[in-house]
């Protein structure tokens, strides 16, 4: 027969497993981008993994102090797009809302522009 102390330890262990096992982390699909304006202003396409109606962009490298204006588009229907959001060295992260319903599990890409020719930005984009 198991002692009370051992039963409590087993019960505590099982409870901890249930709590941590049921909390599955959810990660949105993210793609790295390397964009040069005006040369290559688009990110790789990536499927949107959730139904959150926002996109996220973070610059990790900026070749200059200019501003990069970013907008997310649905690949199959470019009438589905987000508001335009700016990132820069001093404000490298931003998020924007989609202007119409952005379906999950279809492909999106980010397009960007800057008034500063030759600006290069590397970073992450999550549709």
How should these model regions be labeled?
Residues 1-48:
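N-terminal prepro-regions of secreted/extracellular proteins
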């Amino acid at each position: 027969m198991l002692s009370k102390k051992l039963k409590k330890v087993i019960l505590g262990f099982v409870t901890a497993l249930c709590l941590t096992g049921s909390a599955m982390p959810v990660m949105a699909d993210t793609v790295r981008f390397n964009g040069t304006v005006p040369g290559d202003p688009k990110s790789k396409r990536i499927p949107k993994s959730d139904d959150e109606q926002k996109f996220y962009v973070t610059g990790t490298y900026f070749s200059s102090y200019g501003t990069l204006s970013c907008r997310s588009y649905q690949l199959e229907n470019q009438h589905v797009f987000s508001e335009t959001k700016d990132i820069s060295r001093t404000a490298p992260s931003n998020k924007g809302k989609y202007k119409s319903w952005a379906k999950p599990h279809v492909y999106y890409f980010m397009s960007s522009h800057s008034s500063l020719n030759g600006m290069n930005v590397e970073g992450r984009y999550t549709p």
